[in-house]
Amino acid sequence: MKRIIVIYLLSIVLCPMSLFAQKDTVIVVESEARVIEQDTTLTVVPTVVESQKPKVESQEPKAESQELKGDSIAKDTTEGFRFTTIDSVAITSVKDQHRSGTCWAFSTLGFLESEVLRTKGKVVEFAPMYVVSKTMIDRATYCVRMYLEPNFAEGGSAYDVIYCMKHYGLVPKAAMPGIRYGWSEADSLPVHSELSKVTKGYIGALKGMKKLSPVWREGLQAIYDTYLGKCPEEFKYEGKKYTPQSFVESLGLDADDYISLTSYTHHPFYQTFALEVPDNWRMDQMYNLPIDELMRVIDNAIANGYTLAWGADVSEIGFTRKGIGVVPDADKGADLTGSDMAKWVGMSKDKQKEELTKKPLPEKEITQEMRQQAYDNWETTDDHGMQIFGTAKDQNGKRYYMVKNSWGSLRSDYKGIWYISEAFMRYKTNDVLVHKNAIPEDIRIKLKLTVK
């Protein structure tokens, strides 16, 4: 198993009377993923950081990865999964969105944190609720302009974060913690059920009005300011003053470096279109690729030190809370026959899910047509955002993608990391956001992309 030194900087978050009221402890441990965390008072140059320059591109994945392709019958069918890392890119610590619909903000900011690690060797933690506040005001404005037909909800896409970065900048979490209430450690995590109901009620009250006042946005902003805190116009970070825009500039991030990719047949390949899902309300123009080429982009990115923001559907039976995402061939009834098959047919869906995900089993072979059918009949929805950062293999040599979730480090059997099979990635990927330089050259040419 690959041995990788990981630096955890565990912050004890105090009552936010100061932007920098935190302490740090440094712990060196061994893990499958390179996880690096830092408080705003301390700059850490990680001992292991991917090269700033991409490696030589190849049109196919690494030879090691190619050998692991395919879906052979599992040789080791003992209970559980055992994973060995093949390749991984440095990431920051797993965060917890808790009871909020803000996975899109957490996952894409994690992606940008890895970008800063890649280019600067610097650890930073962005403020998700700054992005949420800015985005929800924009979404409310859109809903009102569309006469409230679109659903006003807390969901969003990776592009919302990139749009925010370009137009409003970003801030470190210490400048806007995003929690203004709570009496215990558990209460210091986002709980947005009340906020969502209040803001939906506010927007809903506008419906049917003959004329809107010019201050309705100010009223809505006051609600978000009350629950999340005001978005800072200026702040201090590591002894220097910044605006949200100058902070982004200091980190070398450029919104124009990032593009969204998808793979569906109801629009021409190698052209752009706005994927028709509710959370793409900004109508982000995504580049459309055949699924095989989209998978090549993912593999090439990881091989060259890039991560990806991943928009996916996790409602499938093979996506578990234990940290696994697979597409088991349920039609085979877990390879049962006779009386065992009869028992299988009589199982509840929860029990079937347990049986199909407790050990490596054969998976469905996913085609472009299967992807499209699942999208067209609403089996594939845009319900979750995560960060792809590595590859691994199980005890039988089958290949998986390592994905950072935002459900806290106590979720899953792998400290907040999920292992997603190639079949699941092919089937349930809605879109990915990636740096243009991470795309293989031949695909960039087809998309007519220029890079710096």
How should each PLM-predicted stretch be described?
Residues 83-252, 259-268, 273-280, 285-308, ...:
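Active-site nucleophile-adjacent alpha helix/oxyanion-hole segment immediately C-terminal to the catalytic cysteine
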Residues 23-27, 389:
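Terminal-region recognition feature
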Residues 26-50, 69-89, 93:
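N-terminal regions that are enriched for targeting/export leaders
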Residues 1-24, 63-66:
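Bacterial Sec-dependent N-terminal signal peptides
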Residues 218-452:
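Active-site signature of cysteine proteases
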Residues 34, 63, 373-376:
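Transition segments tied to proteolytic processing and entry into folded domains
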